[in-house]
């Protein structure tokens, strides 16, 4: 079976974890601030705050821009569900706006139209590693929180690296991401006060300079462990190479599949935008077999694929609790119904990519 994803891990990560275990300092040690500083420097941010997951990072970032009970946050319905869930954590309401059919990111015009007097923030998602049009969204007015969980290495058309613009930008390190710490995330920050607040809130509301077990604000256990930070430091050393390998694999896919009639491929880099390759997704032809049938048929051929991603507003919770219905976001619904992720990781060989593409063409009858 060709898997959907595989992390790049080796003896260096093993040695880094073993060194932490032998030190006896498994949490709140020296590796976390080192990882934060190196990661922030990599993306061009003033500060970094390491957290237990991308979801935790989104939650804290939304709190830091003032999202609270009864507020509205405009975001994309085409994302992993955590983007919307983090809004609901603060008893705010996710207000979805449709996506651009080419980039699959939040459409700035649709987002602007969704803003009301109750809108406290806009949360664009850099979907599949392609940079959202944050410069346009910044002009709409409300503060921006960037879901960059899939976008490490991405660059905006104006040359700014995703994470460097001063907005809270949240990265994630799940095993299928551009780099991994197993679980874990990091908030890139451009504001000194937000760094102080996030560092306290991830640690149960206790700032580093406070007395032991004194807490001056509501907080959470959103800490990253020393083992995760140690892995992250090694992964940062590998990152440029892993990003280059991912781009090479994506190029193979695009070259082989470019002539398949009706098959929509990821949009290429254009106008200065550079994708930080996270996954390679395609959209099944509209007159082809159902997406879920394609996934099953590919598995029968020894190839793992996944529906990627279902529309958030059509998930049971968001239908039942927030009242969303089919037909509200037609671009998202069309893309979500046809989109699948193909196997994608740095170690894929050209022969394996050819095998995947051949199987896909056979399954969709092209």
Predicted regions: what is each one?
Residues 79-84:
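Conserved coil-to-alpha-helix start sites within the AMP-binding
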Residues 25-72, 86-90, 96-98:
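Phosphate-binding glycine-rich loop
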């Amino acid at each position: 079976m060709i898997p959907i994803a595989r992390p790049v891990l080796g003896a260096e990560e093993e040695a880094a974890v073993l060194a932490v275990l032998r030190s006896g300092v498994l949490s709140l040690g020296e590796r976390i601030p080192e990882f934060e500083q190196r990661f922030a420097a990599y993306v061009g941010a003033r500060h970094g705050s390491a957290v237990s997951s991308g979801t935790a990072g989104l939650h804290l970032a939304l709190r830091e821009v003032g999202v609270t009970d009864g507020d509205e946050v405009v975001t994309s319905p085409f994302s992993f569900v955590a983007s919307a869930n983090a809004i609901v954590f603060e008893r705010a309401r996710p207000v979805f706006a449709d996506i651009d059919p080419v980039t699959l990111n939040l459409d700035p015009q649709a987002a602007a139209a969704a803003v009301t007097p109750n809108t406290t923030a806009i949360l664009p998602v850099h979907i599949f590693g392609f940079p959202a049009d944050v410069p346009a969204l910044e002009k709409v007015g409300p503060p921006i929180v960037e879901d960059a969980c899939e976008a490490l290495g991405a660059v905006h058309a104006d040359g700014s690296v995703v994470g460097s613009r001063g907005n809270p930008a949240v990265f994630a390190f799940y095993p299928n991401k551009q780099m991994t710490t197993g679980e874990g995330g990091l908030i890139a920050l451009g504001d000194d006060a937000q760094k102080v607040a996030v560092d306290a809130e991830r640690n149960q509301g206790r700032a580093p300079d406070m007395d032991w077990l004194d807490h001056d604000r509501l907080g959470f256990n959103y800490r990253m462990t020393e083992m995760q930070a140690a892995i992250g430091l090694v992964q940062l050393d590998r990152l440029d190479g892993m990003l280059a390998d991912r781009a090479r694999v994506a190029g193979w896919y695009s070259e082989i599949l470019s002539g398949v009639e009706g098959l929509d491929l990821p949009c290429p880099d254009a106008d200065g935008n550079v994708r930080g390759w996270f996954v390679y997704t395609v959209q099944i032809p509209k007159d082809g077999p159902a997406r879920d049938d394609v996934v099953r048929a590919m598995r029968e051929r020894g190839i793992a694929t996944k529906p990627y991603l279902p529309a958030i507003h059509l998930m049971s919770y968001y239908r039942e609790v927030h009242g969303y219905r089919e037909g509200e976001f037609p671009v998202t619904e069309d893309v979500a119904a046809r989109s699948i992720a193909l196997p994608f990781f740095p170690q894929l060989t050209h022969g394996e990519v050819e095998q995947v593409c051949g199987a896909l063409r056979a399954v969709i009858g092209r």
